[in-house]
Amino acid sequence: MTGVSVISIDREEQPNGPRYIADLQGLEEDFPMKLTDYKALTFDCYGTLIDWESGMMEGLKPLTSKLGTALSRNAVLEAHARHESAQQEQTPGKRYRDLLPIVYKRLAEEWGLGVTWAECVQYGKSVRDWPAFSDTAAALQYLKKYYKLVILSNVDNESFSFSNQKLGVSFDAIYTAEDVGSYKPAPANFKYMLDKLKSLGVTQSEVLHTAESMFHDHKPANAIGLASCWIYRRHNDQGFGATMNPGEMPKYDFRFTSMAELAKAHQEQLRA
């Protein structure tokens, strides 16, 4: 895989989280792709465009407020990731808004707390309230001028419809876990997307998959040779938050800490 930001990656643990060091040897010989070479940007939504971690923490307050000893934000998110990932694997056809109540119940059980099913269901509805990152809408509006914009998300259609109102653009295509019948990182989700994109006149080599999650997005993208752009939203934090640890770190072709940085880099390449 070639790229602008990195060719190969070594991981070193640092006090503020993982540090990634690019080995740029041979960069020119590899004729790396530029952002301007792609025809479509395919986005993970939650964690990349929507601040799902803040939304989760707000939605979990009725539960976490009952804890005798407060847990750190990362401890809560990591527990959520464990239960969510396990449930998605066990029931891949269950809609996300119906899966989240089970996650809420599992968290309550892990923490020894009593909850009603009504509380669990309410958490499943909280996706509609999860906020967009402050830079998302403006960046998407800029990128829309140059790319087909596509969503590949691990949610259900109804939940995404609420989030979509906060994103500021009309997407050329939206593919959800409900449509596919499975959750990322399942290969089926990426195959579904790439097959559908052919009808829009877009081939895999023209796609840049843009996402925060190494586990849900970059690892499966690596497996099929799909170019990817890492939006490293957690660059000031430790660990993987609301996503599972991917194990060996996947590679990526571009890295930015925000959508605003991605849009700025595209502008700079146009001027070059």
State the predicted function of each range:
Residues 2-10, 20-41, 115, 141, ...:
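Asp-based, Mg2+/Mn2+-dependent phosphohydrolase catalytic module
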Residues 14-15:
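Cationic, low-complexity basic patches in intrinsically disordered or flexible, solvent-exposed regions
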Residues 34-134, 145, 158:
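N-terminal helical cap/lid subdomain that shapes the substrate entry/recognition surface
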Residues 53-54, 137, 186-187:
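Conserved strand-to-helix beginnings and helix N-cap segments that scaffold or border functional pockets
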